[in-house]
């Protein structure tokens, strides 16, 4: 694991909302869908998705759309989600 990966993992682990929201991103999804699954408000979910995008954990595949934006985990995002899933199982 590279130093940058460790920093991103640590950043996600430190925040309960970040930890939980990354677990609900599966395939293509909208902020509304993720908010409904996670139980967090759309405002908080959108804010966290923006932070994830800046950190390179998710990618918005239609950024010019004002509504119905679709997000997908990047390789780094999947790596972090998988690490968190393994941690939960143990």
PLM regions with names:
Residues 17-24, 79:
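Pre-recognition alpha-helix immediately N-terminal to the DNA-recognition helix
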Residues 1-19:
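Short alpha-helical segments that sit at the start of domains
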Residues 43:
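Key DNA-contact positions within bacterial/archaeal DNA-binding proteins
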Residues 53-63:
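A short, conserved structural fragment
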Residues 34, 49-55:
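Basic amphipathic alpha-helical segments that dock to polyanions
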Residues 65-84:
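Basic, amphipathic "hinge/linker" alpha-helix immediately C-terminal to the N-terminal HTH DNA-binding motif
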Residues 1-3, 79-90:
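Amphipathic alpha-helical dimerization/coiled-coil segments
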Residues 16, 26-33:
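Short capping segments at the starts of secondary-structure elements
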């Amino acid at each position: 694991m590279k130093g940058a990966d460790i920093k991103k993992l640590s950043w996600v682990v430190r925040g309960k909302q970040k930890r939980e929201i990354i677990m609900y991103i599966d395939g293509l999804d909208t902020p509304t869908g993720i908010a409904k699954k996670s139980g967090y408000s759309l405002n908080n979910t959108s804010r966290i998705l923006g932070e994830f995008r800046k950190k390179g954990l998710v990618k918005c595949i239609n950024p010019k759309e004002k509504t119905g934006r679709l997000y997908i985990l990047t390789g780094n995002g999947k790596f972090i989600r998988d690490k968190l899933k393994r941690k939960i199982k143990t």
